């Protein structure tokens, strides 16, 4: 089984699109589950998610854990042996889970599989096809759950650059393959965490300190 984990913090205006793309997968419904981790949002996220409680496993956290903590929480609640992360402001092509699951099942030496992605604007209009090997992101990658536990999950001391920190650890001894089909949609908008320059700068120093070698 595949566990698709959507993490959301104050993305009520986007999370419904993410959920709809998850529900619309070509993979059989019996082969995957959807978990939404609401990281103590203060907007209308709870109200939006209340419409999907029969189709989606919703977890409304009482304390904000940050992206790393919310993803780790989702991993611990997941029933599947394969894990995929979807940020609440992004969405996915309907064949993402089917393609990645088939690839991992037929290539047992691989620990994870990614795909290329499209950058889209706030309205969802495609801007650019991105090669995920050249410009990697953590979302839209299907991991074996055992791999995530072996590599040590996300470091919850990181409130930014957590994906880079995890990537440094996994590239040292694990195998990941990229499929050159753009099956993930990465939305660019003004409130993206990656645009918080102060947080990114602070955690760049933390990243360098942890991985001096």
Label every model-predicted segment:
Residues 1-203:
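Nucleotide-sugar donor-binding/catalytic module of glycosyltransferases
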Residues 41, 208-213:
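Membrane-interface aromatic/basic loop that binds lipid-linked glycans or pyrophosphate carriers
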């Amino acid at each position: 089984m595949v566990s698709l984990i959507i993490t959301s913090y104050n993305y009520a205006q986007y999370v419904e699109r993410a959920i709809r793309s998850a529900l619309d997968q070509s993979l059989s419904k019996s082969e995957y589950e959807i978990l939404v981790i609401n990281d103590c949002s203060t907007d209308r996220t709870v109200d939006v998610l209340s419409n999907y409680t029969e189709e989606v496993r919703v977890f409304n956290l009482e304390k904000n854990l940050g992206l790393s903590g919310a993803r780790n929480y989702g991993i611990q609640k997941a029933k599947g042996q394969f894990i995929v992360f979807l940020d609440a402001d992004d969405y996915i092509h309907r064949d993402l889970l089917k393609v990645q699951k088939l690839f991992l099942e037929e290539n047992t030496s691989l620990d994870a599989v990614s795909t290329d992605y499209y950058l889209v604007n706030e309205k969802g209009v495609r801007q650019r096809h991105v090669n995920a090997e050249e410009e990697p992101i953590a979302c839209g990658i299907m991991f074996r759950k055992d791999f995530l536990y072996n590599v040590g999950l996300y470091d919850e001391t990181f409130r930014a650059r957590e994906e880079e920190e995890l990537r440094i650890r996994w590239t040292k001894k694990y195998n990941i393959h990229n499929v050159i089909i753009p099956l993930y949609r990465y939305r660019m908008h003004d409130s993206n965490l990656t645009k918080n320059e102060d947080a990114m700068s602070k955690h760049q120093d933390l990243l360098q300190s942890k991985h001096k070698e």
